[in-house]
Structures are given as structure tokens and as C-alpha cells.
Amino acid sequence: MDDNKKKALAAALGQIERQFGKGAVMRMGDHDRQAIPAISTGSLGLDIALGIGGLPKGRIVEIYGPESSGKTTLTLSVIAQAQKAGATCAFVDAEHALDPEYAGKLGVNVDDLLVSQPDTGEQALEITDMLVRSNAVDVIIVDSVAALVPKAEIEGEMGDMHVGLQARLMSQALRKITGNIKNANCLVIFINQIRMKIGVMFGSPETTTGGNALKFYASVRLDIRRTGAVKEGDEVVGSETRVKIVKNKVAPPFRQAEFQILYGKGIYLNGEIIDLGVLHGFLEKSGAWYSYQGNKIGQGKANSAKFLQDNPEIGNALEKQIREKLLTASPDVKANPVKETEDDMADADI
């Protein structure tokens, strides 16, 4: 750059700083790059698949899936992990369906959890914005986008048509709160439901509610599905769950993680530690026996997981070793790598 351009740029930067404040424009090389802070999801495999060890702070995240797929359970697990780290969390319960007893079983400190059950979608999003701007809340869950009913729809007759009203509400709200979320370094998670598009011949007929704005503003989008049942004898005690990362602005997308959700207990973390420990050589498996550093810890996965539960120092050490290996490794290392297909690209457009 010649001297005249340098002088012109310096004058422009000086004027911008005087008018808009210091830091309004800066060179990226002037400051050290810092890793994006993350909050664990409570699932080791999902944290690894996300690439940064959890969900990114200061960003919007969307979690969507069919009914009873584990959406609320996953978000309550995020709250439990955040509270363990001393964070303040809020739950905007637009569905009016939050069960404090169930949340407590998943490790949530319900006494410290901020809960709102708004009457309208406008009220829910205004409360969310005010909590973000307080700079005092670290995690906010909005459950769910489909339940953010515009005031005009609530006050109108049952059969009235309100085309695009909810989509416009979401678009306006997200424009308003996105910058505040970044400044407050707050993680905002929107839970969303799935609807079917009529007349789709090719590609996925599934779509999410609330228009397209959330798809653009979300830094991470998670598609969560129930893939099977966990049984003890004939009794169903949990569900096999698969989470696919269909959008990720902070790490490579299209990774996936599989884990179990046990009813009344939440994500089966110790089971994940056993599986990933064997896969990456931290645990030895001989027949049905599992060993750690030459010492047998249990016969069968269930007994070995119970050993880790009874000996949390060993479980924590194993989890730390797995995280250090997989989260500091090259981008090619994945929790559950999947080959990108046309269906994946269709999912990304949901």
C-alpha cells in the first residue's frame, strides 16, 4: 500500500474510532486468536463431534428432531454441565411442559434455574433479549420455536389465517438479539419441531417451524433422532440416540455422535467413556472383561460403567485423556465420521 492510501486509511480509522468508539474497526492480526469457549453437552461423543468440546458460547444453536427424540433432555444436560461450571442458566418454557422433578434427576439445580412461562411469542423473545442484555446469564434455552405463538394469533379466532406471522416474528427477533448474544458471550439454544412439506417428490419432505431466519442465524444446528430402544430383559429403560451436526460454523459439519439416553437418568456418559476408551486404546478389552492400566474394572459394559460411576476419579481421568487426544488431534479425527451424501446436503437445507 502506498503512502497516500496509508494516510487515507489511518484518517478513516481515526474518524471511525472517534465516532463509534475504540475497537469499532481493528486488524485481526493485532490480537491473539482465542479458542471459542464451549459448554459441554454432557455427551462425550457429541462434544468431540462438535470439534470444540461442546456448544459455542456467544452463538445461537438450534436443536430439532421428531417428538420424544431427546431434544429437551439434551438441553437440560447442557444446563446441568453449565451449572457445574458455575454458570447462570435460564429456561424459557413456551410449551409450559418443563418438569422440575425430571430436570433434577438429570443433574439440574432447579433451585438456581431461572424459568419463564410466557403467554405469547413476543413476550418470550422479549424476555430472552432482556436476559441476554443483562450480561449475567450464560445459557438460555427456548422450548420451543413452534410454541412461540404471535399475540395476534392468540387474540384472534381459532380458524383465522395468519400467514407468515411467526416467521416474521422470528426474523425480527433474531436480527435484534444476535449482536447482543455475541457481546454477552451467552449461549442461546432454540429447540424446534419438525413438520412435513406437502407434495415433495425428491429430497427430504421435512422442514422446521418458524421460517428460514433461524437456519441462517444459528452457528450450530443439531438433528437428533431416536434410533432404537435400550432394554433390560423385556423392559425398555432408555433409547439409542443419534445426533447429526447438519450445520457448524466453528468446526467441520456433517459429523455425528451416537449415545444412549436412560429414562430418569439422562445421557449414559460412562457407557460412552467405555466405548471410546476401547476404540482409542485407553481401555483394554479381553473377551467380556475390560481393563484399565492392567487392572480389570468389570465384566461386561454395564459392570464396567458402574465401576466408573463408583470410582469417579478414574472415570474423570479417562474422559480427560479421551478429550485431550481427540480434541487436540487433526481435523480428520472424528467421534463417528460419516460420509457426506446428498441426503446430508438436504438435511442442511431443512
From Swiss-Prot:
Swiss-Prot/TrEMBL keywords: ATP-binding, Cytoplasm, DNA damage, DNA recombination, DNA repair, DNA-binding, Nucleotide-binding, SOS response
Gene Ontology molecular function: any one: damaged DNA binding
Any single Pfam family the record assigns to this protein: RecA_C
Residue segments, region Disordered: 329-350
Single GO BP term: SOS response
GO cellular component: cytosol
Sites where the protein binds ATP: G65, P66, E67, S68, S69, G70, K71, T72
Domain of life: Bacteria
PROSITE patterns reported in the protein's UniProt record: RECA_1 (PS00321), RECA_2 (PS50162), RECA_3 (PS50163)
Subcellular compartments: Cytoplasm
Main location: cytoplasm
Annotated InterPro entries: AAA+_ATPase (IPR003593), DNA_recomb/repair_RecA (IPR013765), DNA_recomb/repair_RecA_CS (IPR020584), P-loop_NTPase (IPR027417), RecA-like_C (IPR049261), RecA-like_N (IPR049428), RecA_ATP-bd (IPR020588), RecA_C_sf (IPR023400)
Biased composition (Acidic residues): 341-350
Family per record: Belongs to the RecA family.
Primary role: Can catalyze the hydrolysis of ATP in the presence of single-stranded DNA, the ATP-dependent uptake of single-stranded DNA by duplex DNA, and the ATP-dependent hybridization of homologous single-stranded DNAs. It interacts with LexA causing its activation and leading to its autocatalytic cleavage.
Matching HAMAP family: RecA (MF_00268)
Annotated protein name in UniProt: Protein RecA
Species whose genome carries this gene: Pseudomonas fluorescens (strain ATCC BAA-477 / NRRL B-23932 / Pf-5)
